[in-house]
Curated annotation (Swiss-Prot):
Disulfide bonds: none annotated. The gene is udp. It comes from Escherichia coli (strain K12). The lineage of its organism: Bacteria, Pseudomonadati, Pseudomonadota, Gammaproteobacteria, Enterobacterales. GO terms for biological process: DNA damage response; UMP catabolic process; UMP salvage; uridine catabolic process. Coiled coil: none annotated. Homohexamer. InterPro entries: Nucleoside_phosphorylase_CS, Nucleoside_phosphorylase_d, Nucleoside_phosphorylase_sf, Uridine_phosphorylase. GO terms for cellular component: cytosol; protein-containing complex. This is Uridine phosphorylase. Belongs to the PNP/UDP phosphorylase family. Optimum pH is 7.3. Its main location: cytoplasm.
Length: 253
């Protein structure tokens, strides 16, 4: 291995060809779909949850790299991409809304995240905000509006766990520990838009280290109405979110 290789992603700095912006979905299967909307897409590597492609926007290189689910694997992807020269990160995901007025198919742009994770504590104390970069947020909002997407901008709750941390009772035990009982109602009262599992780690890492990061998610379910999303709705919502993140990347290059 050359000295420029990183531990997990299977990449060298030369693979990036000078790219400074990365789009980071959680799902490895989403990477190729994103890269296909750009020019000259090429697969670079795939190892565990990390699948990486390179493509071009207006002649400039862009990296698309999956992070897997949750903060720990996200922190690995962000760290190693930063070592290789990435300075701007745009996360794209799907999400469950918790505000009644947010509809399935809407788009959420995160300005900051409630730090319900543990990984972000390895980068900054809890008092440090998990806040998105202003330029990234602006680019995502403008990109969403450019395709006519109904867009909401605000705070996201970012949890280590999908079930108890998001106060889900449709589980094997049906039990949620005392710490999280009633938590969703509190977040709703504070205007929190949604739950997901990566943004607290991403935003804390980047804000505390001089990197730029933004977050956009398509709403696949509203948890005030139901818990399980519709497969066709998921596909359509994902398609809109992918177009938005690519257009935002173009505006930031």
């Amino acid at each position: 291995m050359s000295k420029s290789d990183v531990f997990h992603l299977g990449l060298t700095k030369n693979d990036l060809q000078g790219a400074t912006l990365a789009i980071v979905p959680g799902d490895p299967d989403r990477v190729e779909k994103i890269a296909a909307l750009m020019d000259k897409p090429v697969k670079l590597a795939s190892h565990r949850e990390f699948t990486t492609w390179r493509a071009e926007l207006d002649g400039k290189p862009v990296i698309v790299c999956s992070t897997g689910i949750g903060g720990p694997s996200t922190s690995i992807a962000v760290e190693e991409l930063a070592q290789l020269g990435i300075r701007t990160f745009l996360r794209i995901g799907t999400t469950g809304a918790i505000q009644p007025h947010i509809n399935v198919g809407d788009v959420l742009v995160t300005t900051a995240s409630v730090r319900l994770d543990g990984a972000s504590l390895h980068f900054a104390p809890l008092e440090f905000p998990a806040v998105a970069d202003f330029e990234c947020t602006t680019a995502l909002v403008e990109a969403a509006k450019s395709i006519g997407a109904t867009t909401h901008v605000g705070v996201t709750a970012s949890s280590d766990t999908f079930y108890p941390g998001q106060e889900r009772y449709d589980t094997y035990s049906g039990r949620v520990v005392r710490h999280f009982k009633g938590s969703m109602e509190e977040w709703q009262a504070m205007g929190v838009m949604n739950y997901e599992m990566e943004s607290a780690t991403l935003l804390t890492m980047c804000a505390s280290q001089g990197l730029r990061a933004g977050m956009v998610a398509g709403v696949i379910v509203n948890r005030t109405q139901q818990e399980i999303p519709n497969a066709e709705t998921m596909k359509q919502t994902e398609s809109h979110a992918v177009k938005i993140v690519v257009e935002a990347a173009r505006r930031l290059l």
